[in-house]
Amino acid sequence: CKYLASEEEALDAIFGYTTTLDLTALDVLRKNPRYLTRAKSFDTFFSFGPIVVTKDEVAHVDELEVITEHNGAVFSRDFVRNMHTRPLELVRFHSDYQTLHPGDLI
């Protein structure tokens, strides 16, 4: 799909939701903020899953709580509704610049 005009169209394009681990090498990023792509591109710096929750299992994605933990210690917690750019807007935005296919991860 391409050029999704609304959040409703974006929702139609979503299969489900999963967890991700998105790492950034801050030492690389501090050297030059333009190195964001390099700072995120090392082997093992992105993983997802292992579970995908289908969209019909989530009544309101904005009510999901996101918690970052390491060895049982909570580092951050917040709700999807407080994200700077929420999931439906992300899907709509990316559809303006690339064709989205079934199975794509955003």
Segments and roles (model prediction):
Residues L4-Y17, V28:
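N-terminal accessory regions of nucleic-acid-interacting proteins
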